[in-house]
């Protein structure tokens, strides 16, 4: 097993490498003058299982291309299998058509990752669970809620805590956290009158328990 890091999650990759006592794959990632991304694997990885750690966070377009080109480079370097570890899965918000003439970017990005050569995807708290169904390869969607709950219990007093879901889509996550903490739940009514405008209505009552 070997670990390759992209530019978006270097600190996380280094911590994982140190924890596993498994050094990072030697690679060269740079840009040409026109902004085109260049990736080179500088060591023999033939027959190895590779974990590529790269988020599709800001700048999302650059990080997405870096992810895809890294997968392609690993595939062409004869890696045995490639697991794309994507802590933040960008373009996941657009998981369905909310207006008639728009793209479903989550599906397109899923297709690109699979076509590039990934054999498995590991991510954290997908925007919506159905995105796992956009892939024909295994997808492990990990949940950070138990980790947050442990941290909150250590840092805050229970009688000062209320879990708030920012919209209906976040209710399941907020409820799961509220249950672990045994605290109340509030749900915010979120509406988008326009693409760049969001209207929030704060709750007037709490769901206790």
Language model feature labels by segment:
Residues 2-11, 15-169, 175-179, 185-186, ...:
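Active-site loop-to-helix "anion-binding N-cap" substructures in soluble metabolic enzymes
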Residues 198-204:
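Conserved small/polar residues in nucleotide/adenosyl-binding loops
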Residues 208-209:
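Hydrophobic alpha-helical segments, chiefly the membrane-spanning helices
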């Amino acid at each position: 097993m070997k670990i390759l890091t992209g530019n978006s999650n270097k600190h996380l990759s280094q911590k994982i490498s140190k924890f596993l006592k498994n050094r990072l794959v030697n690679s060269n990632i740079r840009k040409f003058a026109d902004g085109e991304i260049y990736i080179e694997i500088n060591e023999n990885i033939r027959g190895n299982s590779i974990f590529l750690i790269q988020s599709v966070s800001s700048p999302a377009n650059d990080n997405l291309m870096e992810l895809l080109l890294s997968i392609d480079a690993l595939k062409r370097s004869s890696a045995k299998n490639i697991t794309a570890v994507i802590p933040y899965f960008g373009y996941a918000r657009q998981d369905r058509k909310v207006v008639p003439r728009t793209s479903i970017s989550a599906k397109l990005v899923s297709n690109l990752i699979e076509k590039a050569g990934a054999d498995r995807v590991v991510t954290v708290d997908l925007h919506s669970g159905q995105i796992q169904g956009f892939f024909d390869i295994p997808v492990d969607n990990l949940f950070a809620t138990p980790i947050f709950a442990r941290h909150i219990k250590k840092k805050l007093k229970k009688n000062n805590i209320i879990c708030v879901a920012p919209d209906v889509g976040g209710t399941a996550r907020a409820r799961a956290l509220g249950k672990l903490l045994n605290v109340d739940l509030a749900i915010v009514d979120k509406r988008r009158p326009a693409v760049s405008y969001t209207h929030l209505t704060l709750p007037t009552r709490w769901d206790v328990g």
